[in-house]
Amino acid sequence: MARKKIALVGAGNIGGTLAHLIGLKELGDVVLFDIAEGTPQGKALDIAESTPIEGVDASYSGSNDYAAIKDADVVIVTAGVPRKPGMSRDDLIGINAKVMSAVGQGIRANCPNAFVICITNPLDAMVWVLREVSGLPHNKVVGMAGVLDSARFRYFLSEEFNVSVKDVNAFVLGGHGDTMVPLPRYSTVAGIPLPDLVKMGWTTQEKLDQIIQRTRDGGAEIVGLLKTGSAFYAPAAAAVQMAEAYLKDQKRVLPCAAWVEGQYGLDGIYVGVPTIIGAGGIEKVIEIELNADEKAAFAKSVDSVRGLIAASKELMPK
């Protein structure tokens, strides 16, 4: 059976990290695309030269021509500008909406059957633009946010409880921004919900609230430390997990920015929800029961995403 083809649109820090991880997991051949001449070619060659050391059989190539992504099975989009200190994800909308329009046209022309994962911020709105322009089915275009936000939440909880990250399950609902909604009631350590761990004296509600806020600020914390860009190792790992679930039909339950129509009382919007990812793309949106506080927080997050999508509509090339 021929190897799968994975196209990475954007050869910056995330794109390069994605290419390396995809090779290490032997998910398929990799094409790096970027408008910067030499960058995708150089990174592809560098990673290709590591394959004899790592024992990886995969082809790597770089290009400045969208034709190179033709017939890709998976496309992961990281093109656009990253955050700098003091910026919110939403500040990027003016530039990145135009970038997503160009990328969407490239996908429509070259690989209309691909499963597309978007990482570019402001995430939920950029997924919407990408889907609108590419014309792909909603279940084949998705945003990487929830896996990353949930991973940050899980890591902070594992540090607080001094337990393996493998024993911590947690997930985050809503938009990928300051209004995201970490859900303690649905987050567990070895199956024990966080509210019960507070009652057991493992932590305090105050500490838990601090961890939830740190999760919301997780991206900004890294931007502040790096000063010249944003996170790339964890976002790349999150997108690869989603791509692997699709390519191997794993039916993984993963939170991501998916098209929600009917569930949660929503009438068609991209926002972070738990989903099942398999060979059909987003095969199911899982609708969980929310209490009054969680519903209010989720509604606030949805409103924020709606505002960003409305702004994106104005910015898209006519």
From Swiss-Prot:
It is an enzyme of class 1 (oxidoreductase). The active site is at H176 (proton acceptor). Keywords: NAD, Oxidoreductase, Tricarboxylic acid cycle. Substrate binds at R83, R89, N121, R152. Its EC number is 1.1.1.37. GO terms for molecular function: L-lactate dehydrogenase activity; L-malate dehydrogenase (NAD+) activity. It comes from the Bacteria. NAD(+) binds at G10, A11, G12, N13, I14, G15, D34, N96, I119, T120, N121. It catalyses: (S)-malate + NAD(+) = oxaloacetate + NADH + H(+). Gene3D superfamilies: Lactate dehydrogenase/glycoside hydrolase, family 4, C-terminal, NAD(P)-binding Rossmann-like Domain. SUPFAM superfamilies: LDH C-terminal domain-like (SSF56327), NAD(P)-binding Rossmann-fold domains (SSF51735). NCBIfam families: MalateDH_bact (TIGR01763), PRK06223.1 (NF004863). Belongs to the LDH/MDH superfamily. MDH type 3 family. HAMAP family: Malate_dehydrog_3. This is Malate dehydrogenase. It comes from Rhodospirillum rubrum (strain ATCC 11170 / ATH 1.1.1 / DSM 467 / LMG 4362 / NCIMB 8255 / S1).
